[in-house]
């Protein structure tokens, strides 16, 4: 019902992208759980958020089974069974399966719009803090402003091709799941960070944009030559999460990527500062340009 929390623990697959729409459209609040957390932390989040439903990829069966042993609130479990991978070693967690559950839905259902723009749309939890994770509530107004603002700040065109690299549990994928629908974008999902697979998807779907932490960019520039594919067009990249070495910008540009460094927090819906390029800097020496690009705003 309206205001209930629906948790989801999944990779960047279509199910978690769909959840960013389906859950708010029934008036509920999406809680995307970090897939790298241990059972005790997951258990804490499920209890603290008072989750009523948990949608979970079966690959996390071990973590979830252990987590649920300490959860007192009753939770309906819906399993995600990814047909694109071998799931034979994954245990069944809940009694419901995602696609089968969708087939029981009402085609004539009229989605519930928020009565107030300050109503919650998402509940996220910080990581890397002392003690238990801290809950951060996003409201519809803030998510809307972040989604539209990102499109403007990054000069994103209509009908772009976006590769989902940033985990959607991280600040709701920096709010891009909502931005992309506004821009009629093609969304390409990436289950796991695999550089060879990334280059294949970039080539196949003519990817124009993606975001990623500096560690991902480091994997790209240091990947074996046989795993790298020549880019057909420039690919725009946002990076955040840690200070990237300036040399990363130079190496990424040589491969055909244009990188912009941004900064944000879970509490700010994702990135709020960016290093907007000044054309006057084009005449600077290479090292100086890379130094400027490494700034966060």
How does the language model describe each region?
Residues 25-100:
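Structural core segment of the AMP-binding/adenylate-forming
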Residues 103-108, 122, 136-157, 165-169, ...:
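Conserved structural elements of the adenylate-forming
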Residues 144-161, 169-209, 223-224:
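Conserved AMP-binding/adenylation subdomain of ANL enzymes
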Residues 10, 28-46, 58-64, 165, ...:
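ATP-dependent adenylate-forming carboxylate-activation enzymes
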Residues 78-79, 90, 94-96, 102-125, ...:
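Conserved pre-ATP/AMP-binding loop-to-beta segment of ANL
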Residues 1-39:
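Conserved AMP-binding/adenylate-forming
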Residues 21-26, 48, 170, 181-182:
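Short hydrophobic alpha-helices that are characteristic scaffold elements of the AMP-binding
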Residues 182, 207-212, 221-294:
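Gly/Ser/Thr-rich phosphate-binding loop
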């Amino acid at each position: 019902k309206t205001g209930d929390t629906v948790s989801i623990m999944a990779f960047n697959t279509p199910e978690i992208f769909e959840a960013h729409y389906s859950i708010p459209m029934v008036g509920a609040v999406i809680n995307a759980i970090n897939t790298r957390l241990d059972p005790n932390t997951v258990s804490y989040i499920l209890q603290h958020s008072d989750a009523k439903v948990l949608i979970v990829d079966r690959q996390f069966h071990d973590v979830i089974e252990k987590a649920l042993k300490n959860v007192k609130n009753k939770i309906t479990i819906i399993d995600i069974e990814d047909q694109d991978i071998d799931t034979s070693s994954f245990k069944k967690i809940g009694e419901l399966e995602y696609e089968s559950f969708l087939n029981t839905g009402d085609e004539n259902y009229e989605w519930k719009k928020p009565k107030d723009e300050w109503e919650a749309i998402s509940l996220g939890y910080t990581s890397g803090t002392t003690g238990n994770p801290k809950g951060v509530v996003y409201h519809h107004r803030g998510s809307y402003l972040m989604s539209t603002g990102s499109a403007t700040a990054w000069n994103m065109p209509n009908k772009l091709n976006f590769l989902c690299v940033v985990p959607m549990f991280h600040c709701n994928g920096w709010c891009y799941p909502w931005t992309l629908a506004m821009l009629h974008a093609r969304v390409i999902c990436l289950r796991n960070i695999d550089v060879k697979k990334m280059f294949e998807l970039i080539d196949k779907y003519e990817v124009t944009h993606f975001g990623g932490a500096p560690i991902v960019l480091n994997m790209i520039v240091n990947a074996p030559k046989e795993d790298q594919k020549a880019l057909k067009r420039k690919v725009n990249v946002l990076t955040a999460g840690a200070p990237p070495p300036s040399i990363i910008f130079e190496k990424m540009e040589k491969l055909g990527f244009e990188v912009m460094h941004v900064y944000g927090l879970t509490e700010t819906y994702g990135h709020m500062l960016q290093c907007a390029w000044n054309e006057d800097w084009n005449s600077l020496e290479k090292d100086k340009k890379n130094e400027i690009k490494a700034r966060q705003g």
